[in-house]
């Protein structure tokens, strides 16, 4: 039994999407991306019709590659997933590809997911002075020549404190974790899935 997508809602709850779940599991098992912990990948959804496969980066605080399957279409997107009380964070994600049907998605999924596993993520942490904890954390992705920003943590301040910014590059397939690590809030996410 695969360790990928074994958490959250059971795959059997989504009989319509079994082929998609199987294809995604096979890709992750074959590629085994270093920054993806199989125990942190999970399935959630809205009823039996909408299935969401969430693949978080182990150290980016919820930055995730998400496959969203709806009856009318299937898409692949990047989102910051830290709260599943509703699926707004997933809905507001940055779509990178989409397909009109299950068959089209299963056939095209492999090269697209493999490309996304290697997509560089710019991980930016802004600190106030010499503080150890960042006040702002964001992930940025180059999607079709446009820099798309995903805010992970943002503490607003009216004071113009001296600041320093630390920028790193990582991906789901990177072998080395970023220097500043923000664990996925997996306990809370699985309770809400």
PLM regions with names:
Residues 1-51:
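N-terminal domain-onset segments
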Residues 13, 55, 74, 95, ...:
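Acidic, low-complexity intrinsically disordered regions
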Residues 55-58, 79-85, 140-142, 153-155:
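Secondary-structure transition/turn motif
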Residues 81-123:
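Long, charged/polar, surface-exposed segments that mediate recognition or autoinhibition
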């Amino acid at each position: 039994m695969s360790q990928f997508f074994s958490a959250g809602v059971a795959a059997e709850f989504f009989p319509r999407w079994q082929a998609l779940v199987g294809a995604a599991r096979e890709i992750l098992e074959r590629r085994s991306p270093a920054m993806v912990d199989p125990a942190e990948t999970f399935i959630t959804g809205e009823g039996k019709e909408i299935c969401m496969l969430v693949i978080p980066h182990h150290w980016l605080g919820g930055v995730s590659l998400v496959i969203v399957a709806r009856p009318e279409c299937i898409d692949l997107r990047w989102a910051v997933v830290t709260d599943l009380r509703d699926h707004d964070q997933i809905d507001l994600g940055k779509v990178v590809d989409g397909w009109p049907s299950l068959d089209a998605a299963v056939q095209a999924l492999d090269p697209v997911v493999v490309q996304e596993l290697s997509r560089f993520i710019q991980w930016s942490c802004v600190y106030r002075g010499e503080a150890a904890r960042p006040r702002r954390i964001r992930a940025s992705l180059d999607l079709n020549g446009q820099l798309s920003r995903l805010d992970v943590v943002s503490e607003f301040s009216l004071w113009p404190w001296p600041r320093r910014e630390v920028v790193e590059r990582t991906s789901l397939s990177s072998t080395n974790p970023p220097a500043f690590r923000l664990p996925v809030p997996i306990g809370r996410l699985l309770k809400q899935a």
